[in-house]
Amino acid sequence: MPYFTRLILFLFCLMVLVESRKPKRKRWTGQVEMPKPSHLYKKNLDVTKIRKGKPQQLLRVDEHDFSMRPAFGGPAIPVGVDVQVESLDSISEVDMDFTMTLYLRHYWKDERLAFSSASNKSMTFDGRLVKKIWVPDVFFVHSKRSFTHDTTTDNIMLRVFPDGHVLYSMRITVTAMCNMDFSHFPLDSQTCSLELESYAYTDEDLMLYWKNGDESLKTDEKISLSQFLIQKFHTTSRLAFYSSTGWYNRLYINFTLRRHIFFFLLQTYFPATLMVMLSWVSFWIDRRAVPARVSLGITTVLTMTTIITGVNASMPRVSYVKAVDIYLWVSFVFVFLSVLEYAAVNYLTTVQERKERKLREKFPCMCGMLHSKTMMLDGSYSESEANSLAGYPRSHILTEEERQDKIVVHLGLSGEANAARKKGLLKGQTGFRIFQNTHAIDKYSRLIFPASYIFFNLIYWSVFS
């Protein structure tokens, strides 16, 4: 018994010792001020963070078969379209195409996507939902290349309204064919079209239309091209027929481009005109300066050939004549004719000199003259005067064949040469020979060539401008 009593006392003392070592808590009688929540944290309930059951999903995507179009089996579903053109990136004459960046938007109603909303607000999604629902299969007719932009993410937007109306928008760059007519190039205007059409659904299943008529096409005012002036954008629509599949609604984005002429004036027309004018310089060069006139003619011909080759290299190989071809080839003909003109002048000069030598051999100078030289007269003397100056009696008349256009005489320096002095043909007592260096063809060419080229330019610019 004493043993148990001692054990109980020992345990009691141990408990008292343990309690005495614990820290004592002070009782607070005041009020604790809690921090006030900031207005930044006052958010509405985020429904995306609430896990709901399948029947409670707003769009109920998994409950419907979206492989079929809306109202399948009924009338054609109307799909409105509007386009905002962001830029015209390039126009290629060689490939006969254009590149355009645009925002393409579709509008339709799909009751399978209707949802209840107390605030009647729409919901916006990115491109991931597009793969789960039905969207129109619009494609670009006659397109060569096209892609949807994906920087920094896919440029696709889907907006669904509570009543089931859907807005589907995407940003696209497309390169499409443009049938160009270069018969008036570079004084031409081109009309190109971007065509939109449903790939699978005929007009019995899908009715594609411009949502607001011509107002459905918007363009950026800053759109500009280096070689073209954008004159007009407008929309049209019509039906397209395929013998195997039927009729389809097709929408057209039409735009008209007028080419800037100033670039081609500097690069093509002015150089060609200068080459033609340079070829006329040979008409003022001495006809006996063969190297100068020949080298000038060849240089202008080769330069015109280079200009024509450079222009054709930047153009498609069309089977008809362009306006610039007419101008360049006519200019080339003028340059080439200037070369032929000198060939004719040189030939006639050679023939003339040969006849003069024969004439001198036929009528040798046996008039007892101390000093004599041959003189070529320019035709201002009569036949009798020329013969008298030559020391021949009037009965001896040179024939026209002998004289040709120039009369060659032997002039004696004697006291009876007063008639020749009267004509100013003698200087002192020594005879000399006067050469008429400018041929008659050169004289006429100085007027005919410039007048003809100016007349051609007047007709050309009045027809094509």
From Swiss-Prot:
Glycosylation, residue list: N120, N254
Positions of 4-aminobutanoate binding: R105, S169, E197
Membrane topology field: Multi-pass membrane protein
Gene Ontology annotations of biological process type: chemical synaptic transmission; chloride transmembrane transport; gamma-aminobutyric acid signaling pathway; signal transduction; visual perception
PROSITE patterns: NEUROTR_ION_CHANNEL
Pfam families, A to Z: Neur_chan_LBD, Neur_chan_memb
Catalytic activity: chloride(in) = chloride(out)
Cytoplasmic side: 282-293, 347-443
Signal peptide: 1-20
Cysteine pairings via disulfide bonds: C178-C192
Source domain of life: Eukaryota
UniProt keyword terms in alphabetical order: Cell membrane, Chloride, Chloride channel, Disulfide bond, Glycoprotein, Ion channel, Ion transport, Membrane, Postsynaptic cell membrane, Signal, Synapse, Transmembrane, Transmembrane helix, Transport
GO cellular component: chloride channel complex; GABA-A receptor complex; GABA-ergic synapse; intracellular vesicle; plasma membrane; postsynaptic membrane
Residues spanning the membrane: 261-281, 294-314, 326-346, 444-464
Ranges per topology, Extracellular: 21-260, 315-325, 465
Location(s) in or outside the cell: Postsynaptic cell membrane; Cell membrane
GO molecular function: GABA-A receptor activity; GABA-gated chloride ion channel activity; protein domain specific binding; transmitter-gated monoatomic ion channel activity involved in regulation of postsynaptic membrane potential
Subunit structure: Three rho subunits (rho-1/GBRR1, rho-2/GBRR2 and rho-3/GBRR3) coassemble either to form functional homopentamers or heteropentamers. Rho-2 is unable to form a functional homopentamer. Interacts with SQSTM1.
UniProt comment concerning the protein's domains: GABAARs subunits share a common topological structure: a peptide sequence made up of a long extracellular N-terminal, four transmembrane domains, intracellular or cytoplasmic domain located between the third and the fourth transmembrane domains.
Function field: Rho subunit of the pentameric ligand-gated chloride channels responsible for mediating the effects of gamma-aminobutyric acid (GABA), the major inhibitory neurotransmitter in the brain. Rho-containing GABA-gated chloride channels are a subclass of GABA(A) receptors (GABAARs) entirely composed of rho subunits, where GABA molecules bind at the rho intersubunit interfaces. When activated by GABA, rho-GABAARs selectively allow the flow of chloride anions across the cell membrane down their electrochemical gradient.
Family of the protein in this entry: Belongs to the ligand-gated ion channel (TC 1.A.9) family. Gamma-aminobutyric acid receptor (TC 1.A.9.5) subfamily. GABRR2 sub-subfamily.
Protein's recorded name: Gamma-aminobutyric acid receptor subunit rho-2
Annotated organism of origin: Homo sapiens
Gene: GABRR2
